[in-house]
């Protein structure tokens, strides 16, 4: 059986997600799940990024972004868009962008 192609999805998380180590915890959770991508703060108080990896692991991370986050965060919603299958991963690590 051939290995499933990875997927890529963009995300934005709303609520109290800045100043609460959200990016650090997002990077750690992405690494734990074996995902690659990036995370950054926006000027509007949200956190955005991209996830890439096996669809099952990306789904786990999406739930984490919607419901858990960092210990002091308060997530009001998470939006996901531009989901697509990719031939190969476009990132080599899960990075925090400044």
Curated annotation (Swiss-Prot):
Protein's UniProt keywords contain Hydrolase: yes
Residue ranges constituting the Acylphosphatase-like domain according to the UniProt record: 8-98
Enzyme Commission numbers on file: 3.6.1.7
EC class name: hydrolase
MF (Gene Ontology): acylphosphatase activity
Keywords: Hydrolase
UniProt xrefs under Gene3D superfamilies: 3.30.70.100
Record PROSITE patterns: ACYLPHOSPHATASE_1, ACYLPHOSPHATASE_2, ACYLPHOSPHATASE_3
Domain of life: Eukaryota
Catalytic activity: an acyl phosphate + H2O = a carboxylate + phosphate + H(+)
Entry annotation: catalytic residues: 23, 41
Keyword Coiled coil applies: no
Family according to the record: Belongs to the acylphosphatase family.
Protein name in the entry: Acylphosphatase-1
Organism: Xenopus tropicalis (Western clawed frog)
Organism lineage string: Eukaryota, Metazoa, Chordata, Craniata, Vertebrata
Gene from which this protein is expressed: acyp1
């Amino acid at each position: 059986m051939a290995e499933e192609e990875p997927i890529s999805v963009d995300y934005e998380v709303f609520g109290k997600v800045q100043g609460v180590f959200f990016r650090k915890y997002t990077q750690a959770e992405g690494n734990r799940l074996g995902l690659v991508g990036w995370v950054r703060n926006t000027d509007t108080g949200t956190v955005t990024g991209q996830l890439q990896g096996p669809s099952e692991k990306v789904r786990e991370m999406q739930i984490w972004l919607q419901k858990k986050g960092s210990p002091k965060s308060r997530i009001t919603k998470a939006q996901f868009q531009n989901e697509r299958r990719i031939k190969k991963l476009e990132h080599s690590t899960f990075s925090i962008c400044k």
